[in-house]
């Protein structure tokens, strides 16, 4: 489970409600008891539920029921029902709706990608990158995990990933073996992941025996060719495809033999459509 602190939950609420709801105050309805319900109009893999519930309880509302993160909801299914005073209900309305719409959009997009991949490779995986929309990293992470995806890198400090931009600063930027050996010496408990931007680089990298080789923006034909020769050059190396991988392009790579894909596309998926209903207790 991705942990969001109370301060982060408060920040999500404060984006919208720091001044309260003027309309509710002006109508003098804030003291009334009522319910709020969130429905997913189109169905799909849901996430953001636990965060949404924390936001609602922070406002003093009581959660009556909620689905689980990662569950497949039907079109029109209720995701959350909560109760409390109308002032709190109206304060939580849009802030929670925004979190649910964005999170569910991310998780359902990735779930569709995984379903497509696993029709061909049941053991296939999709890892999502650090390139999330600024300020959404933790929300993005919970959405990715809810859909069954992997976190590619949560940050720079705990994983090794050798890019061309690192190699540019080396004395010999084509010395893959030297760079990989140095990384193994100075980070002996870490897997060595490297990225190649062209087939020639990929072959040179494979000869240096990395643990994982990322192929960046390779065509399906180029990826297939590298996948065919990789076992003879580096039998223990895992191949991954990255760069431009999304729900539309993924199908073009399903014949190349690579089972690990790296993408940031789900972060930019269309938000889900969440319907919200607020009603006084007497009408429920």
Swiss-Prot record:
Its EC number is 2.4.2.-. One of its GO terms (cellular component) is cytoplasm. One of its GO terms (molecular function) is nicotinate-nucleotide diphosphorylase (carboxylating) activity. One of its GO terms (biological process) is NAD biosynthetic process. Keywords: Glycosyltransferase, Transferase. Pfam families: QRPTase_C (PF01729), QRPTase_N (PF02749). Belongs to the NadC/ModD family. Orthologs of this gene seem to exist only in pathogenic strains of E.coli but not in the K12 strain. This is Putative pyrophosphorylase ModD. It comes from Escherichia coli O127:H6 (strain E2348/69 / EPEC).
């Amino acid at each position: 489970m991705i942990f969001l602190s109370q301060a982060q939950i408060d920040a999500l609420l404060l984006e919208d409600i720091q001044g309260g709801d003027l309309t509710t105050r002006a109508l003098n309805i804030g003291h009334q008891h009522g319910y709020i319900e969130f429905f997913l109009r189109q169905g799909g893999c849901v996430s953001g539920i636990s965060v949404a519930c924390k936001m609602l309880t922070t406002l003093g509302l009581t959660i009556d029921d909620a689905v689980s993160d990662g569950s497949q909801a039907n079109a029109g299914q209720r995701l959350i029902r909560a109760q409390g005073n109308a002032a709190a209900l109206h304060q939580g309305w849009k802030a929670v709706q925004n979190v649910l719409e964005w999170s569910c959009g991310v998780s359902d997009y990735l779930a569709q990608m995984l379903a497509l991949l696993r029709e061909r490779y049941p053991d296939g995986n999709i890892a999502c990158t650090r390139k999330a929309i600024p300020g959404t990293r933790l929300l993005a992470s919970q959405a990715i995990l809810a859909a069954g995806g992997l976190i590619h890198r949560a940050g720079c400090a705990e994983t090794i990933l050798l890019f061309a931009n690192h190699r540019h600063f080396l004395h010999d930027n084509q010395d893959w073996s030297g760079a990989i050996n140095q990384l193994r010496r100075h980070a002996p408990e870490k897997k060595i992941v490297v990225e190649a931007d062209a087939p020639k680089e990929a072959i040179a990298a494979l000869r240096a025996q990395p643990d994982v080789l990322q192929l960046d923006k390779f065509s399906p034909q180029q990826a297939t060719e590298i996948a065919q020769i990789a076992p003879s050059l580096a039998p223990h190396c895992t191949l991954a495809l990255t760069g431009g991988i999304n729900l539309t392009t993924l199908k073009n790579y399903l014949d190349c033999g690579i089972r690990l894909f790296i993408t940031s596309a789900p972060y930019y998926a269309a938000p889900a459509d969440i319907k919200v209903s607020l009603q006084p207790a007497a009408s429920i």
